[in-house]
């Protein structure tokens, strides 16, 4: 899951951070985040100075947990290196559609489970491996490890893709309600 990493606790209690993975800067300002410390989870909100708001500049954004000093933050167990993720709930929309953070990877996991259930008791003339990997957003590390161990002849990745039809054009790739979207890459 994409997220943030705390890089510094400022004297005024605000937290500097960097992005982990591809996150749109303009989606950050005002967003609630969940910070995972070594002992607990805390909620904060992303705030920004005026220039950062205008320019969507992460360098001018901070996470505010309601603390007024560095010591208050440290007393909560937060330290540089802790990570944060966007705080978003799974929400059912109309017409059997959902809204959720990190839904793409979760959909892929569900599809893998559905595939295994459908193939239960079926004799295959090849070895089938189904797995879930981590760190897709920062260099495909989990997938790289899995392929290095298994050495597959073919790999099929089950993942969600962006719906591009929000632009209002009917020829966009990835339209909701228009069937399965298959993207391919041959290397």
Give short role names for the model-derived ranges.
Residues 1-187:
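N-terminal hydrophobic/helix-forming segments and targeting peptides
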């Amino acid at each position: 899951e994409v997220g943030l990493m705390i890089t510094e606790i400022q004297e005024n209690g605000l937290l500097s951070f960097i992005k982990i993975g591809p996150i749109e800067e303009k989606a950050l300002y005002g967003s609630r985040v969940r910070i995972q410390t070594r002992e607990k989870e805390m909620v904060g909100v992303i705030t920004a100075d005026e220039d950062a708001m205008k320019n969507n500049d992460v360098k001018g954004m901070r996470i505010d947990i309601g603390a007024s000093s560095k010591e208050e933050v440290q007393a909560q167990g937060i330290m540089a290196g802790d990570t944060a993720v966007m705080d978003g709930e799974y929400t059912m929309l109309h017409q059997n559609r959902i809204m959720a953070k990190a839904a793409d990877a979760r959909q892929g996991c569900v599809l893998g489970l559905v595939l295994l259930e459908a193939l239960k008791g079926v004799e295959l003339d090849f070895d089938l491996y189904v797995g879930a990997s981590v760190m897709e957003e920062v260099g495909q590390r989990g997938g790289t490890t899995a392929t290095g161990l298994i050495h597959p002849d073919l790999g099929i990745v089950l993942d969600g893709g962006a719906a591009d039809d929000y632009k209002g054009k009917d020829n966009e790739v990835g339209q909701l309600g228009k069937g399965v979207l298959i993207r391919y890459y041959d290397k």
